[in-house]
């Protein structure tokens, strides 16, 4: 089993030293879903929400969140992301919105946390914008879909 890299020999939280690593291209994709009533989803899809374009706002929030992951998660490194993409898809057959994020850089550490943060914050933003009409929306299935680059190699979720 692989060791926990953020815990030092004394069992204390520790930021990993990546200074000796080579720069490589790293990429990660993540997803999240938010479920809601059909009426709430229809309001989003029709553009009739009084707060404006829900998807555009969630997309920008996800991008901003990816860039600030290091400020939210204590042991994440500040990263110079070269690409952040957040795509939102309405799924009327299941009354959900699927959010998929992509983060990319050339650097010494991976971008999994940035991709997960982007998808999560985009979902939270949808919740925030729609909570006035529905409070029981459910954010679910936040997960890493794929990562490549770095010493741990290529990962694809089952």
Curated annotation (Swiss-Prot):
Keyword Cytoplasm: no
TM helices/strands, residue ranges: none
Enzyme active site: 128
Known catalytic reactions: (8S)-3',8-cyclo-7,8-dihydroguanosine 5'-triphosphate = cyclic pyranopterin phosphate + diphosphate
Superkingdom, taxonomy of origin: Bacteria
EC main group: lyase
Annotated keywords: Lyase, Molybdenum cofactor biosynthesis
One GO BP annotation of this record: Mo-molybdopterin cofactor biosynthetic process
Pfam families (alphabetical): MoaC
Record carries keyword Isomerase: no
GO terms assigned for molecular function: cyclic pyranopterin monophosphate synthase activity; GTP 3',8'-cyclase activity
E.C. code: 4.6.1.17
Cross-referenced CDD domains: MoaC_PE
Family per record: Belongs to the MoaC family.
Subunit organization: Homohexamer; trimer of dimers.
PANTHER family, A to Z: MOLYBDENUM COFACTOR BIOSYNTHESIS PROTEIN 1, MOLYBDOPTERIN COFACTOR SYNTHESIS PROTEIN A
NCBIfam families associated with the record: moaC, PRK09364.1
Function (record text): Catalyzes the conversion of (8S)-3',8-cyclo-7,8-dihydroguanosine 5'-triphosphate to cyclic pyranopterin monophosphate (cPMP).
Protein name per Swiss-Prot or TrEMBL: Cyclic pyranopterin monophosphate synthase
Organism for this UniProt entry: Actinobacillus succinogenes (strain ATCC 55618 / DSM 22257 / CCUG 43843 / 130Z)
Gene that encodes it: moaC
């Amino acid at each position: 089993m692989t060791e926990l890299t953020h815990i030092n020999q004394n069992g204390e939280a520790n930021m990993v030293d990546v200074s000796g690593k080579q720069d490589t291209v790293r990429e990660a994709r993540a997803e999240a879903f938010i479920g809601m009533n059909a009426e709430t989803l229809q309001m989003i899809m029709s553009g009739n929400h009084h707060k404006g374009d829900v998807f555009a706002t969630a997309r920008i929030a996800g991008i901003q969140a990816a860039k600030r992951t290091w400020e939210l998660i204590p042991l994440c490194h500040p990263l110079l992301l070269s690409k952040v993409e957040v795509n939102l898809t309405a799924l009327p057959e299941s009354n959900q919105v699927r959010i998929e994020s992509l983060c990319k850089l050339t650097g010494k550490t991976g971008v999994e946390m940035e991709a997960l943060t982007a998808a999560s914050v985009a979902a939270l933003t949808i919740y925030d914008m729609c909570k006035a009409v529905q409070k029981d929306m459910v954010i679910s299935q936040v997960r890493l879909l794929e990562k490549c680059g770095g010493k741990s190699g290529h990962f694809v979720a089952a």
